[in-house]
């Protein structure tokens, strides 16, 4: 993982002090050239529901050139970011290194400090709150892209017909003395569907500790989308590779990946259904256009080491998290409070 250090931030240099008109002030470290992208393959292992107010699965039309276009399943970033951000909070709570407040509901009183609400999760996934009439914005160091199916939508979705019965198992409403007309379709993404998503960090804002925390938060499998009580764990996540360089490359956009795959002659080829073949195809393309890379197997091994350490070397990892928590707390307090942070610490 050290190969990506030239494109990542430094947890000991999260902020910088500059000279203002009247006095010095603290602000986040200035951005520098550097980009790291995690290319993920999200595999549906049970029915998944990605929808808005309509019952149909969300989609987007992608132009494939020469006047051709098709609809693809589209899961917007928050469908995956929300549960993984939540898992990150749970990890911090276990280590007593953050996660003091619920996700999306940080409330700071005047007597509290920004670090009472902001933590490593805030640095990685972003956060915001209002404190003493000021809006405190923390931009995410990691950006989630849309997740797009590698095959057109009509290959990937299906629907089942349902009715909402009463407790006695019938459709007769005892109150109204009528039959229930509460009938509906449930559209879902079929098991076996593969979606591509890219998580990227730019400007050297994410420290190594943040990347490790992200890998733990992503995990291996989880429950995603709406109406998930129906299917439970429904997504297995595969990291196809990690790629770094001074500049971002257009080839890492999931839209570009899908456009390139659309030119394949046979949409029923194993490439669209087999994670290993798709992973190899993506790595062959992306490795050429980046300065450094880590293969899927290398990432699996590294992620496995993190998981193993989490389970068997808990105290050591807890110490690392708490040390990082102190540095991040100092960063947020000095950024948003300035000199008041030192006075409040005393």
Regions found by a protein language model. Name each.
Residues 1-346:
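RNA-binding basic/glycine-rich loop and surface signature characteristic of RAMP-family CRISPR effectors
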